[in-house]
């Protein structure tokens, strides 16, 4: 008897299948990550919770591909007020700085993060990026102020 894979396992498998095309192809070829995006869009709340629980064990490469799928520049995006920010907190310094530079600003223009805990994690991640010289003082200050203001709004202060 074979056990059926969870949707999270299916998504992870699809992401690892994308390794063969490479991350650059995701940037250049429309629709390459479409199947993975459709799997993600079919998630129930339970699937999403499982994904959040399993993401810390995913490789940085997995996180990079997932971040691209969440924010596909060519077509549709995955409307989530948490996932891209959470990936930012888990990624290594290089990927986190890249996410900050390329995608998070657009993410925040379109979404409001409602999790104060996530905003705290993101603020801590910024500290690490700045102390490891992955972002300059101006970028650091901008994001600290932005996230602090967002956090204040969420707290209703």
Where are these regions (language model features)?
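N-terminal "cap/leader" segments of large eukaryotic alpha-helical scaffolds
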Residues: 1-35
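Eukaryotic acidic, Ser/Thr-rich intrinsically disordered low-complexity regions
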Residues: 2-5, 119-157
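Structural detector for internal amphipathic alpha-helices that build alpha-solenoid repeat scaffolds
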Residues: 27-42, 56, 64-76, 98-113, ...
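Structural detector for tandem alpha-solenoid helical repeats, activating at a conserved register
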Residues: 46, 61, 95-98
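A mid-sequence interfacial segment
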Residues: 87-127
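Alpha-solenoid helical repeat architecture
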Residues: 19-27, 40, 54-59, 88-94, ...
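Residues at alpha-helix boundaries and short interhelical turns
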Residues: 74-77, 94, 130, 134
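Amphipathic alpha-helical scaffolding segments comprising HEAT/armadillo-like alpha-solenoid repeats
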Residues: 2-13, 42-54, 77-89, 113-123
């Amino acid at each position: 008897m074979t056990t059926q894979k969870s949707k999270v396992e299916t998504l992870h498998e699809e992401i690892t299948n994308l390794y063969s095309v490479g991350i650059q192809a995701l940037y250049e070829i429309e629709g390459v990550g479409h199947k993975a995006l459709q799997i993600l869009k079919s998630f129930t709340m339970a699937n999403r919770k499982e994904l959040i629980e399993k993401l810390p064990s995913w490789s940085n490469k997995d996180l990079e591909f997932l971040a691209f799928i969440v924010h596909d520049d060519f077509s549709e995006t995955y409307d989530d007020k948490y996932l891209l920010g959470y990936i930012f907190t888990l990624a290594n310094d290089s990927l986190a700085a890249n996410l900050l530079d390329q995608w998070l600003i657009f993410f925040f223009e379109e979404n409001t993060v409602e999790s104060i805990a996530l905003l705290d994690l993101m603020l801590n991640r910024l500290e690490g990026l700045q102390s490891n010289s992955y972002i300059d003082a101006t970028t650091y200050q901008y994001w600290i102020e932005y996230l602090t203001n967002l956090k204040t709004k969420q707290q209703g202060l």
